Amino acid sequence: MVLLGVGCGRQHEIIGSREVSVAYLWGLAHEGSTQIKEDLVLRGYVTLNDVLGESSRSFVVSDESGGLEVKLDAANIFTFLPLGSEVAIHCSGLYIGREGGTLALGLRPTSVYAVDRIPLEQMLNYIVVGEYVSDCLQPTLIAIGDMDYDDMFRYVMVEDVWLVEEERGLLWCDVDATTGEYISSVRHFTDGRDTLAIVTAPTAIYAGWKVPHYRARCIGVVDIDKNMVALRLSNHQITPMEE
């Protein structure tokens, strides 16, 4: 097997393996867990990690067909899997599982979860990281009304949205009245027609920041919260629309 460094417009050369897309792996997955026995390789870009606490012990890899979550038993994943880095995942021996409408890749499950996390010491058995962080990773522009369950973990951009009036002044995360700790919370943005739910993990470093109320451009991955389609910001990419 030969693996070459990757930059914009360049790819790993993989010999003896069949390259597949995220959509192909979605097609393999059934409710619960499915072992991957073929010599398959998934190539994509890291579109969500723990650099700002937006995920924990996992990262999202996306390609043009969609995205999936890779379960990894490690902290500070961003130090070796930075946003935009290209990865080649050798899937043989891994398990793919559906979890609440999303797709996860990991090891054989030993508990109630669809897959177990890959131990850090085993990561290099499955995951090869390209030499370069891509400067050509671009989200897919999508309208709120077009976002649905088929877009799970797709890396997307929503433009010209603003926080609904009744949520102005709120923080990204609510505080639990009993423990005083932040809890996973949803804030709602609108484009004047449809409403976008943005879900924030309590581990995000901006959990205690006020949600901006300017007309914004939001970039992240499509996720599910309480069985509803939502957006999870990637690297807190919410910026004002240019005048």
Kindly label every feature range from the protein language model.
Residues 1-7:
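Sec-dependent bacterial lipoprotein signal peptides
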